[in-house]
Every structure is written in structure tokens, then in C-alpha cells.
Amino acid sequence: MAAVDSDVVSLPRGRFRCCLCDVTTANRPSLDAHLKGRKHRDLVQLRATRKAQGLRSVFVSGFPRDVGSAQLSEYFQTFGPVANIVMDKDKGVFAIVEMGDISAREAVLSQPKHSLGGHTLRVRPREQKEFQSPASKSPKGVDSNSHQLAQALAEAADVGAQMVKLVELRELSEAERQLRTLVVALMQEVFTEFFPGCVVHPFGSSVNSFDVHGCDLDLFLDLGDMEEPQPDPQTPKLPEASSLDSTLASSLDPQVLACTPASLDSLSPTSLQDSEALDFETPSSLAPQTPDSALGSDTVTSPQSLPPVSPLEEDRGEGKHRKELELAEASKDEKEEATAVLELVGSILRGCVPGVYRVQTVPSARRPVVKFCHRPSGLHGDISLSNRLALYNSRFLNLCSEMDSRVRPLVYTLRCWAQHNGLSGGGPLLNNYALTLLVIYFLQTRDPPVLPTVAQLTQRSGEGEQVEVDGWDCSFPKDASRLEPSTNVEPLSSLLAQFFSCVSCWDLSGSLLSLREGQALMVAGGLPSDLWEGLRLGPMNLQDPFDLSHNVAANVTSRVAKRLQSSCGAAASYCRSLQYQQRSSRGRDWGLLPLLQPSSPSSLLSAKLIPLPSAPFPQIITALVSVLREALGCHIEQGTKRRRSEGARSKDSPLGGANKRPRLSGQEKSCEEGKEEPQGCAGDHSENEVEEMVIELRETPQDWALLHCGPPGELPLMTAKCLDKTAEQNPMEPEGAGEGSPGETEKEASHPSSVSWRCALWHQIWQGRRRARRRFQQQTKEEGRGGPSTGAEWLAVEARVTQELKGPKSEQQRLQGEPLLTFVASASQAEQTLTVAPLQDPQGLFPGLHHFLQVFIPQALKNLLK
């Protein structure tokens, strides 16, 4: 038990944390259940196995690279049985030899000298490192120091201070920036030997002021005019081992300086392929990571239309066809030439840059690149030859961060939020560049604006700042001090809440979010041809600030776009709570912490919609509340009613001004107000729509269920009498019956179109539920009673099952401890679906709950509404 106790740490308010499994429990019973569970027992056994292996193992080095595990095994078997040998996969210069028992290991260590094939072996005991369980390892893209991050954020004074602290913890240190500068200088020195006059420009995260630990090093190799005579790449001398080489290699990795060929003659195609085969694993394992640049989209945009031909050639079909063939042939030649140069750059990286490995040319990308890894610095990077536009994208982002100090904290926070919710990354997800542009567009649409539009910046550019790249106007001031500061003084906490609220209701597919104009351009109405040339529309349309033919979110699928808006809606709902606005005096998570909790699996599950039965929406609302509160024992804190028609609102509607939740301080306008559409929501909302309402369930239950069966201020229980009354008030009618009836129109307009509940659970009421229900049914059968025949009887049975799972001291545990998890359940009348999204899930229980609700909710509503 002592070993188990050493893994457990006591937390405030009766909580416990298992450091071995990286799990936090709400109380002692939950801790005992965890310690007896399979996950904890398996990790305890794995730790014991690893410790025993370490005590039987030795570290061996000094043998040649051509020595294999079979030769080592044959040698060490002279001292005793050999259980396993692990070779160094990277360099092949060391091995871990696990002997069959401790006595064999002691025999190896007692030998004063070991030699194999004429080489002296260095043998020493294996270093005993602290066991790190797979559960405690951070998922890809998540900060490995999450606990330190959470502690630092919890100690901040307010949400704004949390956001500033997040920037300090995630940005590059000065030493990391200097290391990147050295790598760029090394690349510059090497490539200058082959391409005199070339310039290596860094762009992307390293220079756009949104850098994070471990971000890629994106480089643009500017070769100048390729048509000018270039020196013969076969004859130049190789760069000598300079101070840059020694700075990067000797201090970080003494074995990084490899022998380089005397000339590129030795870099034959065969040798290059062999080298690549040695450096690479599989192409799939080297999928490009999403950079913070225009390289982020893996999709290929539509090709530009051919230049217009003269009227004379239009009359000559043969001449036109010949012209097209000539252009196609010229384009093919240029592509082949660019590919050849790209391969040459890859060859130089492989053979002439110390410490570079895993070089891969990607000519098929939208912007062809050469990917590489630099062993001494641990950096991953890309080199592109035709991406000058990305330099100005990076400088534009840097200018935006200099214009207003709130830009960086907001971008860092939203990047971290999107990362933890599985919304950003590669493939169909948002890349960091697109997410950053989305934040800048949002800041352009505030009233007053936080940032100016790109068109306004172009007008304020000076004579020396007029730049055109690839036919696109990239003019903007270089010095932010020349620009007038924004008159917007809203705090960071308010801007973050507004972002979530606005994105949740923007029309992402029906409009084009333009940073140049600072407004949403409707897709249906058509745009000027110069804005549409080659633009590929999709479920999410976000225009590049300079290359107006590029949709930076073209790779985003409809599913990801819906999940983005759903997650923003859940986050906006949370930002209205006191838990977000005020620091907790009880030590519970507050402010940014619930938003930044790792929940990628949960967020993926929350995109799966739970279908609702065909019934009047008020009946469904009432039944859902009863299922959540009575059948499952959820503590329901609040509900949200979303947009509805103002003109059709009943005069007797209980939704008066007193029921509106006060707006956040400084949040004067949001996208729900419908005012100044270009400054707020991008969607084409009706003028009669009113702002979002937040109603406390205990204050206005009649508006939720449209029932008056219970006492005032209390949500009525789902009884047969209430169901009958609901059916009388809202009888089921065939689809289309009574269409256009004024009375029905008024009645339907008074109902909420979308309802949300914030729910909390203190017990895992979904685990063992089938077994508990089976026991109850057996007892009922033995007593001679039949099964439930009405919705009320079914509800009573499920409530009893829940109470049995919770235990006799459930109420005391609820008052003393924190909930296991909290989630938001949102019912939509238009889509007739229920969405469940996690808010707080420290133990990762939401996937199990969601799987249970997918089956339980439809069946429960069917039983209640039959």
C-alpha cells in the first residue's frame, strides 16, 4: 500500500491525484475505485517490469556501426543468458543489453575490459530513469508542461492576466531565437557557395511574433533572377568548417560533423537515393506539419486562367490551339526546371549542411518545398523557392501584433484552445495561419475596430513601402508607430468572449471573410472578378490578405467547420458564467483553465449529433430536462435560448428585460445584435432577430416547457398529468397541417429555437447501469409486479437505478466535492438534434458518457413521449 500511497497526492476540497496515471478524482471512494481499476494495476505492473529490466541491463558503446545485435548477443552470452538487445536506431553507436538475470549483469560489470572485433567496448550500468507512464505523456501538439501551465494560470489575477501569462510561457526564449538565427546563418553560408547572391529569409512562426516552443523553421531561398547565368553547381568548393559549424555542432552534438563529398559529382542519383533511404522512415510518417504560413493548406487551388488572346487569334481556332500548346509546353518546362532546382537544394542539404537529415523534396505541394531536420538544434524546417508572398504575410502579422498589445495574447489563447479541442492541425483542420487571420478579421470588425483593414493600411503606406509581389499589392507601413492607436479599450476577457460568440453564428460557407475589406462578402451575390480569380470556395471561406485568389481555409471540411462553430458556441456559453469572469475562492479551475483542458477525443465526439424524435419542440425540451435531471441525476445550472423572431413574440411572453443576463463589462456589441453587419456577424441574419437570452431554469420554467404543472420557480417533474397537458396544448399534427395559421405561427414563434443546459455529474451513472437495471427488474418480477407501462413509471425506474449507482451518501459527496465532469447539452429545433460538448473533464470520462447518451437519450425520449 505504501507504493500506492506514494503515487497519490491530496488536493484541496477532498480531491486526489494519481500521479502514475495522471488522473484526478473528486473524492476518496472515486480514488479507491481508480486504484482497483485495470488501468492503474496495469501501469503498476508495467513500472515494476521496467524497473526489473533496468536492473538487468547494461549500456554498451564503442563498437563499429556495422556490428549488429546478433554479434553483441553472441559476445555477451559468454557471461550468461541474454534476454533482449535494443540497438540505437538513429546513429547505431550504442546498445542496451538486457541480461537474463541480475547475476549475469554483475558478471558483465565485473569484467575489467571488453573487446569485440578488435574494438574496445565501453560497458557501464544502465542509468535508472524515473518511470513515465504513457498516460502522463502529453498528446501531440499539447504543452508537455501542462501542470505548470495550469498552476501559473490559476495564480493570475484575472482572465486578461492569464492570457498574458500564457504568452510568456509558450513563446520562444531569447536563447531559442538566437539558435534559429545561427541556423539561418549556416544555411546562408552554405547556399551562397552554390548560388552567389542568394538570400535566405526566415518567415512564418519564427518571425511573425506568434512563435511557440518547437515551431518549425520556415525558410525562403531567394535565388534572384533564375535566367541570369549561374555558376556551375558541379565545380564550386564546399563551405569550409566555419565558426557557425562549430557553434552549432560542437556545443550541441560532437558527432554531427559528417564527412562531406569533395564535389557534387559524388552526389550521383544512386547515392542520393541510398542516402534518402537511410535517413527516412516511411513517407506517411513524414507528413508535413502545418506551418504558420501560406504553406499551411495542403490543397491545390484552381489554376489561373490562361492570358487572353488577341481578337485576331480568336478568329483563328488553329492559332489559338497552337498558342495554348506553346503555353502548356512552356509551363511544363518551367515546372521541370523548378523541380530540378528543388532537387539540387535537397542534394546540397543532404551532403553539405552539417547535422541535417531526413531531407525530403515535396514538389507536388501548393508551394513546393524541401523538408529537413537539423539534429544539433532539434529543429524541423522547410525551404521554399517561390514563396516571396509569405514574407509579407509574416511581416503583416508582425505589424498587427505591434499595433495593439492585445493581439498576441488573444492569438496565443485561441491557438491553444483550438489545439486542445482538436480544431487545429493538419489535413482537414484549421492551420495556425488561418486561425490567426480569423482572429485578425474579428478584431477588424469590432466597433470601434481594434485593427485597421488591409485596404486602410495600403492607403497609409509610404513611397518606399509600395510593393507588388506576383501581381498582388503587398503595400503596408513598416513602422507601427506611424499609425494611430485604436480607440477600442475593451479588455482581453471581453474580446475572447466576443470571438467565441461571433464565430458561432458567422455564415462561414455563405460568405467570404475578407481582411482587405474588413467585412464579409456574400457568396451568393457575386464578387468582382479580380477577387474571385482562381478562388476555391468551401465550407469555410477566409481570404488571404494579399493573394486574393487564395482561400486559406479551403482545406477545412464541413464537419470541422460545424465543430468549430459548435465548440465556439459552448465556449461562449461558458464565458457568460461567473466561473469564467471571476477567480475562484475555493481553488477550483476558473477563467481560461476549463477552456484549455485537453479534450481532443471529447471534442471529436461532441461533433456527433444525437437525433431527437419527431415531436413538438416544447415536449422534447420538457422530456430532455426530466431525463437529464430525474433519470440521470444531473445538476442543471442554466439554459440558453438562441435567436428567434422578434415580431412574432407573444405579448404575454415571460421574456422581459429582467430575464436578460447582463452583458460582460465592455462588451457593447456582439454578433447576435445584428447591428452593423460588417462590424459584427458575417451571417445574413434577419432584422427581426433579437440578442441571445440566458434564462435561469429555476426562474422561468414555463418558458422552457410551456407547462404550469409545478410550483412557481421550480421545473415541473415529468408526470403523466403534465405529459397529457402538454399533448393537449401542442397536439401532434401531420407535417404541413395548419400551415400559415396565425395562431400556430404565433405559438411556434414564442418557442425557443435552440435550448442549452449546463449539466454537472458527480457519479459515473452510466457504468454498471445495465446490470443495476437488470437486478431491479428481477426484484420487480419476483414481487409479482409488471414492468413500466407509462413514461412516468419508466422515469421512476431509471431514477431508482441512478440512485442505486450513486449510493446512499451521494448528496453529501455532491456538497463536499467537485463534480466529475460538466458538459453542455444543446437541443436544436431546426436540425431536431441534441449536441453534447464537454466543459470540464479532468479524468477524461466524457467519451464514455457520450457513448452512453447516444443510445440512452433517443430511447428515453421515445418512452416518455409515447
UniProtKB/Swiss-Prot annotation:
Poly(A) polymerase that creates the 3'-poly(A) tail of specific pre-mRNAs. Localizes to nuclear speckles together with PIP5K1A and mediates polyadenylation of a select set of mRNAs, such as HMOX1. In addition to polyadenylation, it is also required for the 3'-end cleavage of pre-mRNAs: binds to the 3'UTR of targeted pre-mRNAs and promotes the recruitment and assembly of the CPSF complex on the 3'UTR of pre-mRNAs. In addition to adenylyltransferase activity, also has uridylyltransferase activity. This is Speckle targeted PIP5K1A-regulated poly(A) polymerase. Residues 282-304 have a biased composition (Polar residues). UTP binds at D216, D218, N393, R415, Y433, H550. GO terms for biological process: co-transcriptional mRNA 3'-end processing, cleavage and polyadenylation pathway; mRNA 3'-end processing; regulation of RNA metabolic process; RNA 3'-end processing; snRNA processing; U6 snRNA 3'-end processing. Belongs to the DNA polymerase type-B-like family. GO terms for cellular component: cytosol; mRNA cleavage and polyadenylation specificity factor complex; nuclear speck; nucleolus; nucleoplasm. It is found in: Nucleus, Nucleolus; Nucleus speckle. A zinc finger (Matrin-type) spans 16-46. Residues 56-128 form the RRM domain. The lineage of its organism: Eukaryota, Metazoa, Chordata, Craniata, Vertebrata. GO terms for molecular function: ATP binding; enzyme binding; enzyme-substrate adaptor activity; mRNA 3'-UTR binding; poly(A) RNA polymerase activity; RNA binding; RNA uridylyltransferase activity; U6 snRNA binding. Residues 599-866 are annotated as: KA1. Phosphorylated by CK1 in the proline-rich (Pro-rich) region. Adenylyltransferase activity is specifically phosphatidylinositol 4,5-bisphosphate (PtdIns(4,5)P2). CDD domains: NT_PAP_TUTase (cd05402), RRM_TUT1 (cd12279). InterPro entries: Matrin/U1-like-C_Znf_C2H2, MTPAP-like_central, NT_sf, Nucleotide-bd_a/b_plait_sf, PAP_assoc, RBD_domain_sf, RRM_dom, Star-PAP_RRM. The modification Phosphoserine is found at S686, S741. The keyword Magnesium applies. It catalyses: RNA(n) + UTP = RNA(n)-3'-uridine ribonucleotide + diphosphate; RNA(n) + ATP = RNA(n)-3'-adenine ribonucleotide + diphosphate. Binds 1 divalent cation per subunit.
